[in-house]
Swiss-Prot record:
Top EC class for this record: transferase
Database matches in SMART domains: rADc
GO molecular function: RNA binding; rRNA (adenine-N6,N6-)-dimethyltransferase activity
Homology family: Belongs to the class I-like SAM-binding methyltransferase superfamily. rRNA adenine N(6)-methyltransferase family. RsmA subfamily.
PANTHER family: DIMETHYLADENOSINE TRANSFERASE, DIMETHYLADENOSINE TRANSFERASE-RELATED
Gene Ontology CC annotation, any one: cytoplasm
Cell location: Cytoplasm
Residue positions binding S-adenosyl-L-methionine: 29, 31, 56, 77, 102, 117
Keywords carried by this UniProt record: Cytoplasm, Methyltransferase, RNA-binding, rRNA processing, S-adenosyl-L-methionine, Transferase
Organism encoding this protein: Methanosarcina barkeri (strain Fusaro / DSM 804)
Keyword match rRNA processing: yes
InterPro entries tied to this protein: KsgA/Erm, rRNA_Ade_diMease-like_C, rRNA_Ade_Mease_Trfase_CS, rRNA_Ade_methylase_Trfase_N, rRNA_adenine_dimethylase, SAM-dependent_MTases_sf
Gene that specifies this protein: rsmA
Protein name: Probable ribosomal RNA small subunit methyltransferase A
Amino acid sequence: MYSIYSGGFSLVRSLLKKYNIKGGTFDQHFLVDAGYLDRIVAAAELGPKDVVLEIGAGVGNLTERLAKKVKKVIAIELDPVLVRVLHDRFDKVGNIEIIAGDALKVEFPEFDKIVSNLPYSISSEITFKLLRHKFKLGILMYQYEFAARMVSQPNCKDYSRLTVDTCYFADASILMKVPKSAFQPAPEVDSAVIKLVPRPVPFEVKDQAFFMNFVSAVFSQRRKKLRNAILNTNYLLKIPNIKEVISRLPEDMMSKRAENLTPEELAQVANHIIDLKTSILANELNE
């Protein structure tokens, strides 16, 4: 049996009043526009065998729509008051599992798709965690500026570590922009829905852990040429014989900034470093 509540704004207003929820705590901005909710669900291409993860389930507007179309919804919520709302609404719904906890700390169960209005304050951390988890499709709401960074291109101001990390794991595209007015209470900025489709890495990476560390390091020095960015962050990268290694890296790339290089070019530099480290270590052993 599904909740007797219907509608968007009226549902949220009644629940906020009933449970004395002030809004704003735990990054609470509930998507209430039925049109956008329906478009998000449609974009997920849900089927009766799907297991769907929802992070930041809130009062359950999206949860309810998802549960009507899939085998199971796993709804994670941190706020104990909202957890109580979800239990009150859905304890009699057999295909909704409610997990009370911090999505950054909870070990995700197996799922096929993730459909969520993500808490904006943890956008980076939760995205990096999700990208390392196996799933088929993600339909995710972010602040618009964050979404723009995910799909940016080299030489653009939004191009960042997040762009490269996203590109490494998945194809990403912005499906729709969502205005502040679609939420209750309204956030200060507009939002966007991103479609994430995981796929094999589209370029060679010889050491994933080093590549990710390398990207993080050089983008922390995004205004520096790559040569100086590597030198300045070698306390993180721990490259032996760093000056010799840099002298043997491609000059055309060393004279550019991280923000000027494609993800594949950054991978090529990281691969060169791995090869040089191996070569230097081998020479030292033979001496």
